[in-house]
């Protein structure tokens, strides 16, 4: 392989990483905005989140196309192959995070028409901030190839589950105490579930980073809490 070809190959891999990083920044913004839309009962911001999901879909398709092209034409091996596959898999997780943010945006639009439920909204906001932080940490780990940071995100997955379980119980209490809150509480329950799924995708990305950097799977069982089993 000539020096020019090697340089071009390296640039293609770097460009793929940069595109995933850019997509991650957009996904972070979408998640932050959907949380803010819930907290502030901000209809226009919620609508912007719903409309903005298309950018992530487009970027994911571009990254997928470029990753497949690189694999087909360059036939990378070992660590280079892991880099390309990681970019592809992470872009897919980010696209799903965008879908979750879009779903939350749609719920936020409905909730702006409902009576305010300040205590529950604050609980959702706290969970949202936690999930937002997890997503930021794991994307920073990807950008900087920080293995320990990725493992840290993976090992703290249980915290998001604890928040979800607490909100689940809180919402049940509200609905049993006042049936008039059932409609709004149901939407908030879906919001919390979408946030939990974003947290799961952050954990999945941490696992992808671990394999990308080490060539080994994270073998320990991921910590997980399930309110329905308790």
From Swiss-Prot:
It comes from the Bacteria. One of its GO terms (cellular component) is cytoplasm. Pfam families: PhoU. The keyword Coiled coil does not apply. It is found in: Cytoplasm. GO terms for molecular function: protein homodimerization activity. Keywords: Cytoplasm, Phosphate transport, Transport. Its main location: cytoplasm. GO terms for biological process: intracellular phosphate ion homeostasis; negative regulation of phosphate metabolic process; negative regulation of phosphate transmembrane transport; phosphate ion transport. InterPro entries: P_transport_PhoU, PhoU-like_sf, PhoU_dom. Belongs to the PhoU family. Homodimer. PANTHER family: PHOSPHATE-SPECIFIC TRANSPORT SYSTEM ACCESSORY PROTEIN PHOU (PTHR42930:SF3). Plays a role in the regulation of phosphate uptake. This is Phosphate-specific transport system accessory protein PhoU homolog. The lineage of its organism: Bacteria, Pseudomonadati, Pseudomonadota, Alphaproteobacteria, Caulobacterales.
């Amino acid at each position: 392989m000539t020096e020019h070809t090697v340089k071009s190959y390296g640039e293609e891999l770097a460009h793929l990483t940069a595109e995933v990083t850019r997509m991650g920044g957009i996904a972070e913004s979408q998640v932050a905005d959907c949380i803010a839309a819930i907290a502030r009962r901000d209809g226009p911001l919620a609508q912007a989140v719903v409309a903005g999901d298309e950018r992530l879909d487009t970027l994911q398709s571009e990254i997928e196309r470029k990753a497949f092209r690189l694999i087909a034409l360059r036939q990378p091996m070992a660590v280079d192959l892991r880099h390309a596959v990681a970019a592809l898999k992470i872009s897919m997780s980010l696209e799903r995070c965008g879908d979750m943010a879009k779903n939350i945006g749609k719920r936020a639009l409905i909730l702006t028409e409902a009576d305010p439920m300040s205590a529950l909204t604050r609980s959702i906001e706290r969970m949202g901030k936690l999930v937002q932080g997890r997503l930021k940490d794991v994307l920073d780990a990807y950008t900087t190839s920080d293995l320990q940071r990725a493992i840290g995100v993976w090992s703290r997955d249980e915290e998001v589950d604890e928040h979800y379980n607490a909100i689940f119980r809180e919402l049940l209490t509200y609905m049993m105490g006042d049936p008039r809150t059932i409609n709004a509480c149901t939407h908030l329950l879906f919001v919390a579930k979408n946030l939990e799924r974003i947290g799961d995708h952050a954990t999945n990305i941490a696992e992808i980073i671990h394999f990308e950097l080490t060539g080994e799977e994270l073998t320990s069982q991921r910590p997980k809490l399930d309110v329905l089993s308790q």
